[in-house]
Amino acid sequence: MSGFSLSDLESIVAERSTASPEQSWTAKLVAAGQPKAAKKLGEEAIEAVMAAVTGDRDNLTYEAADVLYHLLVVLKIAEIPLENVMAELERRTAQSGLKEKAGRQSS
């Protein structure tokens, strides 16, 4: 198991977001703004879905990494720390998924 974490990736995204857009894909995405970054996240998510549906495990692993990276870029632009997402996941896992979903539908 790797010692690399999503928190590590979040730190790398934050660091690279301040680099020159000519020298960093992360900085280029951040400079392009949320619409571009969100579109790229969507494209990567579709590629991950396609890999899952076709049963291509290696490609799914590759695309899942792209999804996580691009999600962290989108969160960076929105100024939402990964910690907030993890807190939301923790809140949701404190109850069953069906109960949590029902609670969202009645809100």
Swiss-Prot record:
<keyword id="KW-0378">Hydrolase</keyword>
<keyword id="KW-0067">ATP-binding</keyword>
<keyword id="KW-0368">Histidine biosynthesis</keyword>
<keyword id="KW-0547">Nucleotide-binding</keyword>
<dbReference type="GO" id="GO:0005524">
    <property type="term" value="F:ATP binding"/>
</dbReference>
<dbReference type="InterPro" id="IPR021130">
    <property type="entry name" value="PRib-ATP_PPHydrolase-like"/>
</dbReference>
<dbReference type="GO" id="GO:0004636">
    <property type="term" value="F:phosphoribosyl-ATP diphosphatase activity"/>
</dbReference>
<keyword id="KW-0028">Amino-acid biosynthesis</keyword>
<protein>
    <recommendedName>
        <fullName>Phosphoribosyl-ATP pyrophosphatase</fullName>
        <ecNumber>3.6.1.31</ecNumber>
    </recommendedName>
</protein>
<dbReference type="GO" id="GO:0000105">
    <property type="term" value="P:L-histidine biosynthetic process"/>
</dbReference>
<comment type="similarity">
    <text>Belongs to the PRA-PH family.</text>
</comment>
<dbReference type="Pfam" id="PF01503">
    <property type="entry name" value="PRA-PH"/>
</dbReference>
<comment type="pathway">
    <text>Amino-acid biosynthesis; L-histidine biosynthesis; L-histidine from 5-phospho-alpha-D-ribose 1-diphosphate: step 2/9.</text>
</comment>
<dbReference type="GO" id="GO:0005737">
    <property type="term" value="C:cytoplasm"/>
</dbReference>
<keyword id="KW-0963">Cytoplasm</keyword>
<dbReference type="InterPro" id="IPR008179">
    <property type="entry name" value="HisE"/>
</dbReference>
